[in-house]
Amino acid sequence: MRTLTLLTTLLLLALHTQAESPQGSTKEAPDEEQDISVFFGGDKGTALQDAAVKAGVTCSCRTSSCRFGERLSGACRLNGRIYRLCC
């Protein structure tokens, strides 16, 4: 259940980030993979944040398929391009 909640939150975060991206960006993202940090805001720690820290969850935006040990968790947008979010 916690995993489902974490994945849902990551997906919503990716969609929210995509909606806030400025339109018409002229910069192109490099074709290399880029790591991103996921932060769960708020003054107090949440159970979801605590679970993510304990589990050591690290997510990356990947141009190709997810690496061994990672799962496709949604999509992320960098500089106007959409990538795979692998955690």
UniProtKB/Swiss-Prot annotation:
Q: Which GO terms describe its biological process?
A: antibacterial humoral response; antimicrobial humoral immune response mediated by antimicrobial peptide; cellular response to lipopolysaccharide; defense response to fungus; defense response to Gram-negative bacterium; defense response to Gram-positive bacterium; disruption of plasma membrane integrity in another organism; innate immune response in mucosa
Tissue and organ distribution: Highest expression in bone marrow and to a much lesser extent in small intestine.
Disulphide bridges: 59-87, 61-76, 66-86
Location comes to:
Secreted
Q: Does the keyword Iron apply?
A: no
Q: What InterPro entries has UniProt attached to this entry?
A: Alpha-defensin (IPR016327), Alpha-defensin_C (IPR006081), Alpha-defensin_N (IPR002366), Beta/alpha-defensin_C (IPR006080)
The residue range of the signal peptide is 1-19
Q: Which residues form the propeptide?
A: 20-58
SUPFAM superfamilies given in the database record: Defensin-like
> Per UniProt, which keywords does this protein have?
Antibiotic, Antimicrobial, Defensin, Disulfide bond, Fungicide, Secreted, Signal
Keyword Cell inner membrane on entry: no
Main localisation: secreted
Q: What cellular component terms from Gene Ontology apply here?
A: extracellular space
Tell me its family: Belongs to the alpha-defensin family.
Q: What does this protein do?
A: Active in vitro against S.aureus, fungi, Gram-positive and Gram-negative bacteria and to a lesser extent against an enveloped virus.
Tell me what this protein is called: Neutrophil antibiotic peptide NP-3A
Q: Which organism is it from?
A: Rattus norvegicus
Its organism's taxonomic lineage begins at: Eukaryota, Metazoa, Chordata, Craniata, Vertebrata
